[in-house]
Amino acid sequence: MKIRNVFIGLIVSAVLVGVVSCGSGSGDYGQPPAGGSQPPLEPTLDSIQANVFSMDCVGCHAGATPPQGLSLESADSSYTNLVNVPVPRDTSQVRVKPFDPDHSFLIHKLEGTQGSIGLPMPLRGLPLDPSKIAVIRQWITNGALRQ
């Protein structure tokens, strides 16, 4: 019984460390640009990158081995890893389906409607502001353009 309790304690500790380390982090990630306020959020990839992905996602989705191969470190990597890319755990779905936010897995992950495939994002436990999700939905509705 003691070994089981130690094992459960180790698992809980590992999960907590993972969740805490995936927060907005310190340093450049999650910080507004030096010398000014954050630019307004618009339904363009560059704006979403600066205001959402770089602020709320790169704490986990960066580096050499990001979760599910999804690097969101730059607008280029975000576009390459999101638009028309199959979901690794369910290749019948795509991460971002241009013109169709209701069939874009990214929206399901952000809204917590992803079903049994993983957890809602961002993982740190605080849901993304609905106004940010609405702008991402609009970007997808507009065709999820790179420009």
Model segments located where?
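Post-cleavage N-terminal segment of exported redox proteins
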Residues: 1-43, 137-147
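Solvent-exposed helix-loop boundary motif
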Residues: 26-41, 46-130, 134
